Design a protein with these regions (language model features):
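Absolute protein N-terminus
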Residues: 1, 19-20
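Positively charged n-region of N-terminal signal peptides that target proteins for export
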Residues: 1-4, 108-109
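Cationic, low-complexity basic patches in intrinsically disordered or flexible, solvent-exposed regions
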Residues: 15-17
């Protein structure tokens, strides 16, 4: 029954818009390339991140995400280049994004302003042939392609200093719909189909050893309700951080981060579903590993938050 319900839900969403499995991450501050291409190069060194998310633990065929990103500043730090590979699975649906990221960066007052573009492809696969259909000759199943390669584009801007950041982006702004008569996917490009992301945060120094960093992620789609992530993070000696987040869908998130040395950071979070569906869906695990090569403490970045 769980598999059936999830498949029906995913199917209804996919028939409306394809290629729009937007990344969901508790650690968007340190994994920002997933939602904003202007983040490329902002670590001021070659940076590699591995991300894994297991959503709704205990719910069969629930969403799972894996991600690998690499980015660095080049050409006198004016340009940021990056590569993002992201895989999302929901039930019988699988989507893999391959994106090359480019950012143009300029110094502005005590920080840097960046404009970014990501371009690549989305490889979409479904498992229609895995479904046990009552009628194996059902037209909807027979006329749906099992795979497709679709263009993908993201845009964004990002400003950051050692103490605060603000960003705006349109991730994966192209959408696609399935033409039932031809059995092919068609490109749709409309402002009403865009997702708008706004992020911001500031690090306060409570004492020489303790910091407090509130941040926020606002997601807006013209056809959906606004979703907001409110985040708080307390840091100790720039080595360990603990925090809580609240997502405006009755989701409470507990997180911890450890800076093992100047280059290696590990982050973990667990989502508690506080809604009436929480007892059926379970929580979600997320882990992020980040390694920065040739770290330089004297440049405007890396950010201290």
């Amino acid at each position: 029954m769980n598999r059936f319900l999830l498949t029906v839900l995913a199917l209804s969403l996919q028939l409306q818009l394809l290629g729009q499995m937007l990344p969901l991450s508790d650690h968007y501050v340190y994994n920002a390339l997933a939602i904003n291409p202007a983040f490329a190069g902002s670590e001021e060194a070659l940076s590699a991140t591995i991300f894994y998310r297991n959503q709704w633990v205990g719910f069969k065929d629930a969403p799972k995400s894996q991600m690998l990103s690499v980015h660095a500043p080049v050409f006198n730090d004016r340009i940021g280049l990056g590569l993002l590979i992201e895989n999302n699975t929901v039930g019988i649906f699988k989507e893999t994004n391959f994106l090359g990221n480019y950012s143009y960066r300029m110094e502005l007052r005590d920080g840097k302003l960046s404009f970014g573009l990501a371009f690549g492809a989305t490889v979409y696969n479904n498992g229609w042939n895995e479904l046990d259909a009552t009628d194996p000759n059902d037209y909807q199943l027979m006329n749906n392609p099992t795979s497709a390669v679709l263009p993908a584009i993201s845009l964004g801007t990002y400003y950051y200093t050692k103490k605060y950041f603000i960003g705006f982006s349109l991730p994966l702004l192209l959408s696609h719909s399935l033409n039932q008569s031809t059995g092919k996917y068609e490109l749709e490009n409309s402002f009403s189909g865009y997702n708008y992301f706004l992020t911001g945060g500031y690090e306060f120094s409570i004492s020489p050893m303790i910091t407090f960093t509130p941040s926020m992620l606002v997601k807006y789609h013209p056809q959906n309700a606004i979703q907001i992530d409110y985040n708080t993070l307390f840091g100790l000696k720039d080595k360990v951080w603990v925090g809580l987040s609240y997502r405006s869908q009755d989701i409470l998130v507990a997180m911890i981060q450890c800076q093992l040395n100047y280059q290696f950071r590990i982050s973990y979070s667990y989502d508690f579903n506080m809604s009436s569906m929480g007892k059926y869906m379970g929580g979600s695990h997320e882990i992020v590993l980040n390694y920065v090569f040739r770290y330089n403490r004297k440049v405007i970045g890396p950010r201290e938050f």
